[in-house]
Amino acid sequence: MSWLDKIVPSMSRTQRADRRKSVPDGLWRKCPNCEAVLYLPELERHQSVCPKCDHHLRLTARKRLNWFLDTEGREEIAADLQPVDRLKFRDSKKYKDRLAAAQKETDENDALIAMRGKLDGLPVVAVAFEFSFMGGSMGAVVGEKFVRAATQAREEGVPLVCFAASGGARMQEALFSLMQMAKTSAALEKLKQEGVPYISVLTDPVFGGVSASLAMLGDINVAEPNALIGFAGPRVIEQTVREQLPEGFQRSEFLLEHGTVDMIVHRHDMRERLGSVMRKLTHQPHQDRDAEPDDTASQSTLDEFSQADH
């Protein structure tokens, strides 16, 4: 082998290594559905919807609310609330250590963000679960933030919208967590008594105590495409009943077919569609009178709520 043959492969390896070093980390993400490798800035422009197969990837709570609400006038609700390890709980790790790790990973205090703002000029209060924070589990802070958001919506007479993404109640808070199911449900009952609309948007995934309480109590329940929604997971159910579940069981399309949700809305259409529904429920004129929105919510559902309001 000549001296040139010895040098050239070494130079090629060095150049390849330099190129790899010049590419920043976190620029690419693989679609869990079609496995296409996606350029992250492009994916974010598509609101985390795969441009190849239209799969809805999970979206952080803050990005979701910043995208959903108008840019001007957003105001966070109860941003200063911090979780407390009252029980000194420990499983394989201390609860306080899990909280610290989740806060560092997500840069959020807990698994729910609440904001007051506008949707195409219509005042609204919106909350969103952060699934990356301990699986979006509901503890005392999540419940308190939700109740404060519902209270503000009731006092101001503006619609409340919830984007749910949760594994359920937070086991590290035991009964303090389970109490939030009743607490949030009671807040929504007060909202209903005042005739204030509550729209629940079910995103992937929604399970456990969250699905058994606030997530399924919407005046209109909306789901994103192919979202996994239920109480217990499909594997748990199969092991319990010892039967094979139907294809697509617990997916939003299956739930729509069986009447559990009222409509499925693509993420790109969410602002327009929910804005249209809320304007109907609050008897507000549409922004664009010439373009009638394509609502798939049954008119009877909207009429029932309007009649209950009177």
Swiss-Prot record:
Its EC number is 2.1.3.15. Residues 27-296 form the CoA carboxyltransferase N-terminal domain. A zinc finger (C4-type) spans 31-53. It is an enzyme of class 2 (transferase). Its cofactor is Zn(2+). It catalyses: N(6)-carboxybiotinyl-L-lysyl-[protein] + acetyl-CoA = N(6)-biotinyl-L-lysyl-[protein] + malonyl-CoA. It comes from the Bacteria. GO terms for molecular function: acetyl-CoA carboxylase activity; ATP binding; carboxyl- or carbamoyltransferase activity; zinc ion binding. Residues 282-310 are annotated as: Disordered. The keyword Transferase applies. Binds 1 zinc ion per subunit. Zn(2+) binds at residues 31, 34, 50, 53. Component of the acetyl coenzyme A carboxylase (ACC) complex. Biotin carboxylase (BC) catalyzes the carboxylation of biotin on its carrier protein (BCCP) and then the CO(2) group is transferred by the transcarboxylase to acetyl-CoA to form malonyl-CoA. Belongs to the AccD/PCCB family. This is Acetyl-coenzyme A carboxylase carboxyl transferase subunit beta. It comes from Chromohalobacter salexigens (strain ATCC BAA-138 / DSM 3043 / CIP 106854 / NCIMB 13768 / 1H11). The lineage of its organism: Bacteria, Pseudomonadati, Pseudomonadota, Gammaproteobacteria, Oceanospirillales.
